[in-house]
Regions:
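A short, small-residue-rich loop immediately preceding and capping a beta-strand
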Residues: 1-7, 157-162
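Condensing-enzyme catalytic core mediating Claisen C-C bond formation in acyl metabolism
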Residues: 9, 15-78, 82-85, 164, ...
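Claisen-condensing/thiolase-fold acyl-transfer catalytic domains that form or cleave C-C bonds
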Residues: 99-177
Protein backbone atom coordinates (compact mmCIF):
# COMPACT_ATOMS: atom_id res chain seq x y z
CA UNK A 1 0.00 0.00 0.00
CA UNK A 2 1.32 3.43 -0.92
CA UNK A 3 0.47 6.26 1.50
CA UNK A 4 1.09 9.74 0.09
CA UNK A 5 0.88 13.13 1.77
CA UNK A 6 1.36 16.25 -0.35
CA UNK A 7 0.43 19.92 -0.23
CA UNK A 8 1.37 23.04 -2.19
CA UNK A 9 0.57 25.94 0.08
CA UNK A 10 2.47 28.34 -2.19
CA UNK A 11 -0.56 28.22 -4.51
CA UNK A 12 -3.01 29.44 -1.84
CA UNK A 13 -0.78 31.68 0.29
CA UNK A 14 -1.13 35.44 0.55
CA UNK A 15 2.55 36.43 0.60
CA UNK A 16 1.65 39.75 2.24
CA UNK A 17 0.12 38.03 5.30
CA UNK A 18 2.27 37.31 8.36
CA UNK A 19 1.33 33.60 8.33
CA UNK A 20 3.01 33.10 4.94
CA UNK A 21 6.29 32.05 6.62
CA UNK A 22 4.62 29.17 8.48
CA UNK A 23 3.90 27.01 5.43
CA UNK A 24 5.92 25.21 2.79
CA UNK A 25 5.30 22.93 -0.16
CA UNK A 26 6.11 19.27 0.22
CA UNK A 27 5.34 15.68 -0.62
CA UNK A 28 6.17 12.45 1.14
CA UNK A 29 5.26 8.82 0.71
CA UNK A 30 5.52 5.59 2.65
CA UNK A 31 5.19 2.06 1.25
CA UNK A 32 3.49 -0.37 3.62
CA UNK A 33 3.34 -4.10 3.04
CA UNK A 34 2.13 -7.09 5.00
CA UNK A 35 4.84 -9.10 6.72
CA UNK A 36 5.21 -11.91 9.23
CA UNK A 37 7.67 -10.03 11.41
CA UNK A 38 6.80 -8.12 14.54
CA UNK A 39 7.65 -4.75 13.03
CA UNK A 40 5.54 -2.35 11.03
CA UNK A 41 2.28 -0.50 11.48
CA UNK A 42 0.10 -2.17 14.06
CA UNK A 43 -2.48 0.33 15.26
CA UNK A 44 -4.17 3.48 13.95
CA UNK A 45 -7.00 5.74 15.00
CA UNK A 46 -8.64 8.54 13.03
CA UNK A 47 -11.09 11.11 14.33
CA UNK A 48 -13.02 13.94 12.72
CA UNK A 49 -15.53 16.63 13.56
CA UNK A 50 -16.86 19.31 11.26
CA UNK A 51 -17.06 22.20 13.71
CA UNK A 52 -13.68 23.54 12.57
CA UNK A 53 -14.49 23.60 8.87
CA UNK A 54 -14.23 27.39 8.64
CA UNK A 55 -11.18 27.77 10.88
CA UNK A 56 -8.64 26.77 8.22
CA UNK A 57 -9.83 26.63 4.64
CA UNK A 58 -9.91 28.16 1.20
CA UNK A 59 -13.43 29.47 0.77
CA UNK A 60 -15.08 29.10 -2.67
CA UNK A 61 -14.01 31.99 -4.89
CA UNK A 62 -11.09 33.00 -2.67
CA UNK A 63 -7.52 32.83 -3.91
CA UNK A 64 -5.90 32.31 -0.49
CA UNK A 65 -6.41 30.17 2.56
CA UNK A 66 -7.97 31.64 5.69
CA UNK A 67 -6.79 30.55 9.12
CA UNK A 68 -7.98 31.31 12.63
CA UNK A 69 -4.59 30.81 14.29
CA UNK A 70 -5.98 30.86 17.82
CA UNK A 71 -8.56 28.15 17.05
CA UNK A 72 -5.98 26.04 15.20
CA UNK A 73 -3.51 26.22 18.10
CA UNK A 74 -6.21 25.45 20.67
CA UNK A 75 -7.45 22.41 18.75
CA UNK A 76 -3.96 21.08 18.00
CA UNK A 77 -2.79 21.39 21.59
CA UNK A 78 -5.83 19.55 22.95
CA UNK A 79 -6.72 17.01 20.24
CA UNK A 80 -3.17 15.77 19.58
CA UNK A 81 -2.38 14.93 23.23
CA UNK A 82 -5.81 13.30 23.64
CA UNK A 83 -5.20 11.23 20.50
CA UNK A 84 -1.75 10.19 21.74
CA UNK A 85 -3.17 9.08 25.08
CA UNK A 86 -6.04 7.21 23.42
CA UNK A 87 -3.96 5.16 20.99
CA UNK A 88 -1.60 4.23 23.82
CA UNK A 89 -4.53 3.29 26.08
CA UNK A 90 -6.08 1.12 23.36
CA UNK A 91 -2.80 -0.78 23.05
CA UNK A 92 -1.99 -1.07 26.76
CA UNK A 93 1.05 1.18 26.39
CA UNK A 94 2.37 4.34 28.00
CA UNK A 95 4.50 7.21 26.79
CA UNK A 96 7.46 5.47 28.44
CA UNK A 97 7.13 2.71 25.80
CA UNK A 98 7.40 5.16 22.88
CA UNK A 99 10.89 5.71 21.45
CA UNK A 100 9.95 8.92 19.65
CA UNK A 101 6.97 10.93 18.52
CA UNK A 102 6.82 11.88 14.83
CA UNK A 103 4.15 14.61 14.73
CA UNK A 104 2.55 16.93 12.25
CA UNK A 105 4.78 20.01 12.04
CA UNK A 106 2.33 22.79 12.91
CA UNK A 107 4.57 25.39 14.57
CA UNK A 108 7.35 25.16 17.12
CA UNK A 109 5.07 26.76 19.72
CA UNK A 110 2.35 24.17 19.13
CA UNK A 111 4.83 21.29 19.33
CA UNK A 112 6.32 22.64 22.57
CA UNK A 113 2.85 23.00 24.07
CA UNK A 114 1.98 19.42 23.08
CA UNK A 115 5.13 18.23 24.88
CA UNK A 116 4.08 20.22 27.97
CA UNK A 117 0.54 18.80 27.94
CA UNK A 118 1.92 15.26 27.57
CA UNK A 119 4.48 16.02 30.32
CA UNK A 120 7.42 14.81 28.24
CA UNK A 121 10.73 16.44 27.33
CA UNK A 122 10.55 18.29 24.02
CA UNK A 123 13.51 16.19 22.84
CA UNK A 124 11.11 13.21 22.49
CA UNK A 125 9.30 15.09 19.71
CA UNK A 126 11.01 15.07 16.31
CA UNK A 127 10.96 18.26 14.22
CA UNK A 128 11.99 19.50 10.80
CA UNK A 129 10.24 22.87 10.76
CA UNK A 130 13.58 24.61 10.42
CA UNK A 131 14.11 22.89 7.05
CA UNK A 132 10.64 22.67 5.50
CA UNK A 133 8.15 24.70 7.59
CA UNK A 134 4.64 23.24 7.87
CA UNK A 135 4.11 21.15 4.74
CA UNK A 136 0.64 20.08 5.95
CA UNK A 137 -0.16 16.58 4.68
CA UNK A 138 3.49 15.92 3.87
CA UNK A 139 4.90 16.65 7.34
CA UNK A 140 4.79 13.16 8.86
CA UNK A 141 6.20 11.17 5.89
CA UNK A 142 8.87 13.84 5.29
CA UNK A 143 9.89 13.82 8.94
CA UNK A 144 9.90 10.01 9.12
CA UNK A 145 12.26 9.91 6.14
CA UNK A 146 14.50 12.56 7.67
CA UNK A 147 14.67 10.75 11.03
CA UNK A 148 15.56 7.54 9.20
CA UNK A 149 18.28 9.24 7.11
CA UNK A 150 19.77 10.74 10.28
CA UNK A 151 20.22 7.20 11.62
CA UNK A 152 17.96 7.82 14.61
CA UNK A 153 15.80 4.72 14.08
CA UNK A 154 16.78 1.34 15.49
CA UNK A 155 15.22 -2.09 15.17
CA UNK A 156 12.45 -2.43 17.73
CA UNK A 157 11.87 1.31 18.22
CA UNK A 158 8.22 2.19 18.81
CA UNK A 159 7.23 5.28 16.83
CA UNK A 160 4.08 7.25 17.48
CA UNK A 161 3.02 9.13 14.35
CA UNK A 162 0.36 11.78 14.98
CA UNK A 163 -1.23 14.48 12.85
CA UNK A 164 -4.05 17.00 12.74
CA UNK A 165 -5.65 18.75 9.81
CA UNK A 166 -8.28 21.21 8.74
CA UNK A 167 -11.88 20.57 9.38
CA UNK A 168 -10.96 19.08 12.09
CA UNK A 169 -9.39 15.70 11.40
CA UNK A 170 -6.71 14.06 13.51
CA UNK A 171 -5.22 10.67 14.09
CA UNK A 172 -2.31 8.60 15.26
CA UNK A 173 -0.51 5.39 14.34
CA UNK A 174 1.90 3.13 16.17
CA UNK A 175 4.76 1.73 14.15
CA UNK A 176 7.39 -0.76 15.33
CA UNK A 177 10.63 -0.10 13.42
Amino acid sequence: MLVIGADTFSKVTDWNHRDCVVFGDGAGAVVLERNDRENGLFSSILLAEGEGMNEFTVFPGDAYFTMNGKAVKEKATTAVPECVREILRLNGLGLIDVSMIVPHQATLGVLKRIAEVLDIPFSRIQTNLESYANTAGATVPLLLDQVNRRGLLHTGDLLLLVSIGAGWTWGASLYRW
